[in-house]
Amino acid sequence: MPELPEVELTRRRLERELTGKRIDRVVVRTPKLRFPIPQELHVSLPGRTVRSVGRRGKYLLFDCETGWLIVHLGMTGFLRLVAGTAPPGKHDHLDIVFADGTVLRFHDPRKFGTVAWTTDAPATHPLLAAIGPEPLTATFDGAYLFAVTRTRRVAVKQLLMNAAIVAGVGNIYANEALFRAGIRPDRPASSLGRPECERLARTVREVLQESIDQGSTYRVEEETVAYHPLNFDVYGRGTDACTRCGGALEEIRLGNRSTVFCPRCQT
């Protein structure tokens, strides 16, 4: 699943390539993904110019003069820039065709992605209104994390993956941040002390920023997108040896998600 770094890299590429371009038409091949694709796109988008591409959590926000196109890539989705002559594939559900012939194509095999349209401020849209602070901003720090964990006994990893607590932290980077912070993922969030919250807020920022930095060669137009450029310490490593102590990692399920940690290094 594309997480915050992958969405941010997509945003940067699309803003660089699409800002200032005028939309000619919209082609919808699959009327319903996670939710129905708004019919008004056929009327609202043609003739409009992309002014910027923003991001809120894992959502991409296209400023199209009179409104905002909101896109979530879901579990398997990605956006490609292709030539207008490129034939669509089986899972290419939406094309936004620009006046210069460029096509922004939404590919999503599992159809869990979302496309929405709003003429109001994006922050007020139901998809975005309840999202928590961005983890790479000053509003997400140890003091904030300490405050929101006081009454929550849910596992700390599940708390990190709750978009209402912090935006855009998924399974991959929650695993990695907790390892760096030395905190077991299944610990009740309320058991964390202030120093642990400070440490965890810092490692969340570190793993996200490092992944963005290492993904500088990410290319949104490639069909086989190389997500997750970070060299992982625990994610996807099952019972391999810990990169820090050499002991065996453990794999458990939390919230129906695979969770890997080191029982020696994380307490």
UniProtKB/Swiss-Prot annotation:
GO annotation, biological process: base-excision repair
A Pfam family recorded for this sequence: Fapy_DNA_glyco
Cofactor, how bound (note): Binds 1 zinc ion per subunit.
Which of UniProt's keywords are assigned here? DNA damage, DNA repair, DNA-binding, Glycosidase, Hydrolase, Lyase, Metal-binding, Multifunctional enzyme, Zinc, Zinc-finger
The coiled-coil segments of this chain are none
UniProt lists the family membership as follows:
Belongs to the FPG family.
Q: How does it assemble?
A: Monomer.
The record's section on NCBIfam families has: fpg, PRK01103.1
Which PANTHER family does the annotation name? Answer: FORMAMIDOPYRIMIDINE-DNA GLYCOSYLASE (PTHR22993:SF9)
Its biological function? Involved in base excision repair of DNA damaged by oxidation or by mutagenic agents. Acts as a DNA glycosylase that recognizes and removes damaged bases. Has a preference for oxidized purines, such as 7,8-dihydro-8-oxoguanine (8-oxoG). Has AP (apurinic/apyrimidinic) lyase activity and introduces nicks in the DNA strand. Cleaves the DNA backbone by beta-delta elimination to generate a single-strand break at the site of the removed base with both 3'- and 5'-phosphates.
Protein name (database record) = Formamidopyrimidine-DNA glycosylase
